[in-house]
């Protein structure tokens, strides 16, 4: 019998416990509204890593949308430290003159990422 306080795992553990109690996987799956394939996947996870292995894991790598490359990001941080009084628009324009391309909002995003969003933090 499996016990857990985690609400994500509770349903899955309940399915496994019900199947054990009824001694019938098909009936337990019908009652809980899941497929038998799902039941066997849950059971395999428990066999491999215990009850805590049932926590949902994303299969995808995180998609960081509009993430600037490291060189541009470092250029923005260096510029912000060198010229803390310049705003995001002027910083973007000056970086374009130096050969890089980053939008105003891109500069702002990099500042937020590095905790440089206001003048006091850039000094």
UniProtKB/Swiss-Prot annotation:
Pfam families: HTH_29. InterPro entries: Homeodomain-like_sf. It comes from the Bacteria. This is Uncharacterized protein YlbG. It comes from Shigella boydii serotype 4 (strain Sb227).
């Amino acid at each position: 019998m499996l016990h857990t306080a985690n609400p994500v795992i509770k349903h899955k553990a309940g399915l496994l416990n019900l199947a054990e109690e009824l001694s019938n996987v098909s009936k337990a799956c019908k009652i809980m509204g899941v497929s038998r394939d799902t039941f066997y996947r849950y059971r395999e996870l428990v066999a491999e890593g215990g009850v805590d292995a049932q926590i949902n894991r994303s299969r995808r790598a995180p998609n960081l949308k509009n993430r600037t490359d490291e060189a541009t990001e470092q250029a923005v941080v260096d510029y912000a430290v060198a010229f803390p009084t310049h705003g995001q628009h002027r910083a973007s324009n000056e970086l374009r003159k130096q050969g890089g391309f980053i939008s105003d909002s891109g500069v702002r995003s990099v500042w937020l990422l590095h905790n440089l969003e206001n003048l006091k933090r850039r000094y």
